[in-house]
Amino acid sequence: MEEASLCLGVSSAEPEAEPHLSGPVLNGQYAMSQKLHQITSQLSHAFPELHPRPNPEEKPPASLEEKAHVPMSGQPMGSQMALLANQLGREVDTSLNGRVDLQQFLNGQNLGIMSQMSDIEDDARKNRKYPCPLCGKRFRFNSILSLHMRTHTGEKPFKCPYCDHRAAQKGNLKIHLRTHKLGNLGKGRGRVREENRLLHELEERAILRDKQLKGSLLQPRPDLKPPPHAQQAPLAACTLALQANHSVPDVAHPVPSPKPASVQEDAVAPAAGFRCTFCKGKFKKREELDRHIRILHKPYKCTLCDFAASQEEELISHVEKAHITAESAQGQGPNGGGEQSANEFRCEVCGQVFSQAWFLKGHMRKHKDSFEHCCQICGRRFKEPWFLKNHMKVHLNKLSVKNKSPSDPEVPVPMGGMSQEAHANLYSRYLSCLQSGFMTPDKAGLSEPSQLYGKGELPMKEKEALGKLLSPISSMAHGVPEGDKHSLLGCLNLVPPLKSSCIERLQAAAKAAEMDPVNSYQAWQLMARGMAMEHGFLSKEHPLQRNHEDTLANAGVLFDKEKREYVLVGADGSKQKMPADLVHSTKVGSQRDLPSKLDPLESSRDFLSHGLNQTLEYNLQGPGNMKEKPTECPDCGRVFRTYHQVVVHSRVHKRDRKGEEDGLHVGLDERRGSGSDQESQSVSRSTTPGSSNVTEESGVGGGLSQTGSAQEDSPHPSSPSSSDIGEEAGRSAGVQQPALLRDRSLGSAMKDCPYCGKTFRTSHHLKVHLRIHTGEKPYKCPHCDYAGTQSASLKYHLERHHRERQNGAGPLSGQPPNQDHKDEMSSKASLFIRPDILRGAFKGLPGIDFRGGPASQQWTSGVLSSGDHSGQATGMSSEVPSDALKGTDLPSKSTHFSEIGRAYQSIVSNGVNFQGSLQAFMDSFVLSSLKKEKDMKDKALADPPSMKVHGVDGGEEKPSGKSSQRKSEKSQYEPLDLSVRPDAASLPGSSVTVQDSIAWHGCLFCAFTTSSMELMALHLQANHLGKAKRKDNTIGVTVNCKDQAREASKMALLPSLQSNKDLGLSNMISSLDSASEKMAQGQLKETLGEQKSGAWTGHVDPAFCNFPSDFYKQFGVYPGMVGSGASSSCPNKEPDGKAHSEEDVPILIPETTSKNTTDDLSDIASSEDMDSSKGENNDEEDVETEPEMMTKPLSALSKDSSSDGGDSLQPTGTSQPVQGLVSPLSQAPEKQWHSQGLLQAQDPLAGLPKPERGPQSLDKPMNMLSVLRAYSSDGLAAFNGLASSTANSGCIKRPDLCGK
C-alpha cells in the first residue's frame, strides 16, 4: 500500500480508506454507494438550480455530502434511490424493490440532464485534442498524454539511486527521496545517532585546538602520538555521519565506505601548513584538512560522487539534479526488467536522452544554437518558422525581382556566341557570375577562385571568398582590346551561366547583397551597368545592335522636366527616350553608395569613370581588409554589424519617397561622387559625416562632388555658383548640358541622413543635423565652456546665462561673418576681439599701449588726417614715465608690439579663434555703430536746446565743422571697446561681491544687499540720498549756471537710459582719461617744473581741501574735480570769475586753458574708482605715492586721496592711472579715438585769462537720474561724438559738438 501511494504521488502518512469505500464492488471496480455518491455530486455541481431552496424559518436540510458520509451499506437500496430522486426532483417507482439498473434510471428519467452534460463534454472534447488509444481519456497537450501512457505501459524511467524504487514521473521520485531522510532521521534511533555525531564533532574541534596550541608552544616530537580515542573518534564520527545520512532500509545495499587514506598521497605541506577556509584552522597534512572539512563543515557527502554539502537539503537537491537525470533514460517494462529502451532520442548538446522525439524538440529550445528553420537563399537559420517567413519577405522586397520585360517577349540575341535570357533574368545573371567566380571563356582566370572553392585551402568565410573573387578583374580588364568592350561582358571578359534555377539566382543576389560594403558596392554597380548595357540587346533594333552599343557606351541619362521623362543623351547631343524598365534599373543601380566611415578603404577605391566605355578597375588592398567588415544598408549607406540589423533598419525606407521621380539622374556614375576631372576615378568620399557626399536617396542621383563640396561650407547652401555632380559628370562624358540644369539648385533634392535615415530639403539642414551624430559643436560660448550644434542654441544659452555680460555686440563665435562686409572689413579688423576674451590674456601687461603699436595704424591711416597724425604722435600713454616724455615714441612702439605678440600667443594657446572671432565681431559692430549713429542724430535733432553750447568770441564755429566731418568718419570705423572692467560694477555707495556667478550689491551705509542694481539705486535714493538733499537745502547756496546746466544734462541724457551699465561706465572713464591726457599735452612744458617741485600754487584753491559734505565723502565724489575751461560754458553767468564761498564746492584752476574737461559724470566715475579700490582691491599695485610719480601728465584722477577717505585731493597735475575699472591696455584705443574731437579744442580757449574761468560747484546731491545716467550705454555717444548733446551738468563745453 505504501509503495502504491508513492507511485501516485500520495504520502504514505495518509489514513486508511473509509469502510464504506471498501464495500461490495460493482463490475469489479467501485462500490454502488460510491458510484451513487459521485454521480450525485457531479449533478449537484453542474446544475445548482436543482438544489432545494431552504425556507428561512426552517432548518436547512443536511447536505448531500453529509448524508453520503453516513454508512450507506446499512441503509436499504430503496432509501438511497429515494434520496437521489429527491435531489433530482423525480419520483421513484417503488416496484424496483432495491434492485435498480442505474443505466436505465439515468437514461429514462434524466435524459434531458444527461444531454446537457454531453454538450459540456463535447466542448471539453474539442479542447482536448489528444485522446488515449487505450482508455479513451483525452488531454489538452501531447506531453500529458505521454505521461499518461506510462500508466498503461508500466514504464518507470526514474529510479531511486539508493534503492530499487522506480517512478513514472520525476516528481514522484522526489517524494520518494524524502522518505529516505524521514524514515531514518525521524525515528528515535536516528536522533541518538545525530546527537552522538555532534558530540564527536565537538571533541574533534577541542582536540584540534589543543594540538594547535601545543604546536605553537613546543616543538612536536615525531614519537609523540595522540591518544587512541582521539584517533578513533573522528573515524567513528565519519562513519556515523555517513550512516545517518545515507543509510538504506535494505541490508543488501550497504553504504560504500569512503576512499581509503592511502589513495591520497601526502602533500608537501608549506611552512604555514594547510588552513581551513571555514574556521581558519591550520593542518600539517592535506588529509587532515580534508577530513576536518568533511566531518565538521561538509558532513553530507554523496555516495554516488565526490559531492559534499554542509546541509542536508543541498545534498538532496544534488541527487535530484545530477543522479535522477542520469538514470531517467533507463526504461522498465511491466515485468520490472531494467533493460534500456531502444527508442532513445539523445540531445547532442548536453547528452540528455528522451523517450520521444517531441520531448527532444521541446528540449532543444533551451539551447541557443537550435536554429532548425533555414533560409534557402542566404542560409540564415531561425528558431521559429514564422521568423523564416518574415525573413523571406525581406529577400523579395529588397532584391525587387520583378518580371518586367520589354514589349516583345523573350528574343534570343546573340552576344559573344551565347544565347541570352529574358530581361527579367538580367538582375541575377551578373550576380550569378559573381558567385560562379567570374568564369572566363578560356577558364584561365579561374585559377585562384577554383583553388579557393575546390581545394578549400584557405579557411575563409563565404563573404570573404566572394570579396577575393573580385581581385582578378583589374588584371583582366587591361588585357582586353578595345574592340571587345562594346558590352559589359566584353569589358569584363566574362561569360555568365546560361541557365539557373530561381533559387540559385536568389541565392546569388542575396549573397551579393550581404557582402561587405566594398564587394557589395561592386556587385551592385556591376549589375546596374549590365542592365543598362543589356537593354540594347533586348531592344527592337536588332540589326542596329552594334551601333546601339556604341551609342550606349557614350550616353548619359537626363531628365526632361517639361516632358517628365528620362532621355538618353548621346555624345552628339541627340536625345532618345529611355524606357521605364531601364529607368528603374538605373535607380536601383544608383542607390548603392559607400559609407563615409570606412576610412582604411578610402584611398583604395578606384571605380568606373564617367563614360561607360571606360575600363573597370577594382583596386583593393587585399583580402585582409575584407575581414570583419560591417554590413551596409543599400538605401542610405548606414553601416551595421549584422545583417539582421540591416533588415530591421530597412523598414525605415519602406515609405514612399516624394520627389524621387521629380529629380534628375545625370549619368550612371553620379551616385559614386565622381569628381569633375577625368583623372580622378576615385570615389573616396569625405570622411567628415557632415560633407555633402553622404546624401543618399536624394532623387536627383547623388550628392556633391569633391570640388562642389565647398558649397556646404558657405553660408548659402543653395548657391547656384556651387558645382554639382550632374553637371560635372555630363561634361566628362562629352555631353552638353542644358542651361536649365546648370541653373538648378540643390534645394529641391531630398537629402537623407546616413545615420538615422531622416530626410532634409537642403544639404545645409542635413549638415546641421549631422552634427548631432558626429558630436561637432562649432558654436562655442565666449564666457564658459558651453558649445552648441546650432546658432539658436548658443543664442538661447547667452540669453539665459550671460545676459548681463553681453554688451550688445557681435554675432556668435561660431557664426560665419556676413558676406557683404567680409571684403570691406578684412583689411581693417586685425587686432580687435571681445573684451571678455582679451581680459585674461592682456591682464598683467601694464605697459602696453595700442597707440604706440603698428597695428593701430590700420585705423588711423584710414580715419585720421595728417594733423591728427601729428597730434597723435605727441600723445603718450599715461603710464609712460616723465623722463620718457622727452624722447620719441619709436622704442615704445616696438615694446608694445612685442607685448601685443605675447598677448596674442596667450590667446592662441588658450584656444581662442582669434581671426574668426575678430572678423565676426567687427562685421556686426560696424552695422550696430551705423544704426546707433542714425538714432543719435535723430535724437539730437529733436532736442535743440541741448545742442546749443555758448562759446567765447565765436570760438565754437571752427571746431563744429571738423567735428561733424570726423563724426561721420568715426561712425563707419567705430573702434571696439577694449576697456577691462570687472564683471559687475558697483553703484556709488555700494560694493559688489560675486558668488556663484551672481553679482550681489551691498550698501555701504547699511546692511541692505540685493542682486539687482536697480533696486540698489532705489534703495540709495530713498534711504541715503534724501538725507544729503535735506542737509544741502539747509545751506541754501545755489548757482543759476549749475542749475540750468544740470537741467540741460537731464534732458540730454533722459532718452539714453539703458540697461547696459557696464559699457557706459567704462566709456565715460575712458573719455575722462582721454580729456585729461589732451590737457596734459598742452600743459606739459609749462607745468613740468611745477609738478616736479610739487608746488600747489595756481592749481588748486586753498578751500578745495575743506570739503563739508559727508555724503560725498562716502561716495568719493568731489565736485571740485572738474577741469579747466568751465567758465567758457557760462560766460554770461559768471563774468567776474569770482570764487564761491566755502559752503560751495571749491574750484580747480589749472595753469592753461587749452583744453576743456569733463562734467560731474567724471566725478561719478572717480567715485567708482574709489569704490572698486575699497571693495575689490583689484589693482593695488597701481596706487603710487612716490614723489617722482607726480610728474606724470594730467590723464586721470588721483586714487590716493579717494582711498584715504576724501580728506584731501591731489592736484590735476599729479595724475595717477585709473586702475579700478579701466586698465592701461583698455584705455589706449579709447584714448586714441576720444581724443580726436579734443585735438581741435586748443585754440579757441587758449587766450582766456584765468579770472574768466568761472568756478564750478556741485551743490545738488546725486539723485536717481544721475545714478542711472552713470550706467547708461548711450553715455558713450556723448563722449565719442556720436550724439550732439552736451550731457554736462557742470556746463562743460564740448568743442567738437558746439556747432551742431
Curated annotation (Swiss-Prot):
Stretches with biased composition (Acidic residues): 1160-1170, 1178-1187
Superkingdom of origin organism: Eukaryota
Biased composition, class Basic and acidic residues, residue ranges: 48-69, 594-604, 657-674, 950-972, 1133-1143
Composition bias, Low complexity: 1194-1209
Zn-finger segments (C2H2-type): 130-152, 158-180, 274-297, 300-323, 345-367, 373-395, 631-653, 751-773, 779-801
Cellular localisation: Nucleus
A GO CC term assigned to this protein in UniProt: nucleus
Polar residues: bias regions: 675-696, 856-880
GO biological process terms held by the UniProt record: negative regulation of neuron differentiation; negative regulation of retinoic acid receptor signaling pathway; negative regulation of transcription by RNA polymerase II; regulation of DNA-templated transcription
Keyword Repeat listed: yes
Keyword line: DNA-binding, Metal-binding, Nucleus, Phosphoprotein, Repeat, Transcription, Transcription regulation, Zinc, Zinc-finger
InterPro entries xref list: Krueppel_C2H2-ZF (IPR051967), Znf_C2H2_sf (IPR036236), Znf_C2H2_type (IPR013087)
Entry-annotated residues carrying Phosphoserine: S826, S827
A molecular function GO annotation: RNA polymerase II cis-regulatory region sequence-specific DNA binding
Chain intervals for the UniProt region annotation (Disordered): 1-26, 47-77, 584-604, 650-739, 802-826, 856-893, 937-985, 1124-1260
Cystine bridges: none
PANTHER family for the chain: ZINC FINGER PROTEIN (PTHR45925), ZINC FINGER PROTEIN 536 (PTHR45925:SF2)
Role this protein plays: Transcriptional repressor that negatively regulates neuron differentiation by repressing retinoic acid-induced gene transcription. Binds and interrupts RARA from binding to retinoic acid response elements (RARE) composed of tandem 5'-AGGTCA-3' sites known as DR1-DR5. Recognizes and binds 2 copies of the core DNA sequence 5'-CCCCCA-3'.
Assigned protein family: Belongs to the krueppel C2H2-type zinc-finger protein family.
Name recorded for this polypeptide: Zinc finger protein 536
Organism whose genome encodes this protein: Homo sapiens
